[in-house]
Amino acid sequence: MNENISADKIRLLAGVRRIVVHPGLAHVDDIMSCAMAYAFGVRHDAVIERRRPEPADLDDLETLVMDVGFALDPARLDFDHHQRSRDEPPRCAYALFAEWLGVDEEMRRLFPWYETWNAIDTLGAHATALKLGTTGDAIAGLVAHPLGEWVIRHFADNPEFRARVALGLGKEIDKTRRSWESLREKTKTLDVAGLPVADFRDCPADEISRCSDIWIRLHRPACIVCYDNRGSGLTLLRCNDDVRLDFHRCAGRPYALFAHPGGFVLKTQTRDDDLKAILADARTDRT
């Protein structure tokens, strides 16, 4: 998966023995910086140290310094952003690391959190909310949600948990990147009843759960179809609240196992149910 990263950079990362991030309260930036380091080639037994780097650390190619140190020097594996001026593009530590690797565009495409948390870390939650066309109060529950807050506190306080979280998140990044490449090859785009449909029936459930949202964002289908992972039929999911589809219109049809009252999900009785007939029934512009 890292074939587009230069051999010199891969060798540099393979030699890293420790990752130094800032002490005190942890943030998404330093946690995901560690995760991305593991995902893109740092050996999994490299220890995470939460402390201020010494001058020798900034020169040591066995030490990857992330989000601390007031230095951006990729050749020495130093990736901090706190010394950058307001006139420079807002880039947190993990974004600077990704730019150096040449995977910044890929990360933006595959992971919605990537750009949002880059903005929150560099601009602040209030300015990010304004950038998104809303208010700080409106996104407060997303920024400070209970799972994230719990992980952040324990990442700061528990070295064993810290390593497990960073390694686990790094593996998730790697799995999603691999799953996306596989899903791209297997997904078919169909024209059914005059609607663009993403057909995921050749894709394993894990690939769909990881990557279907990516496909939807990039290709904007009216709906997706896949095999029901809880039953013996099909699952159809309306995308982007497409006004042309309301699957609740299918309720009571012989093929319908479950039609969500909200109109965005339909589960069918069998895998052989007629997709064209189903979508024709669900069209809101047809009687």
Regions found by a protein language model. Give the residues of each.
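Active-site rim beta-loop-alpha module in soluble metabolic enzymes
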Residues: I152-I216
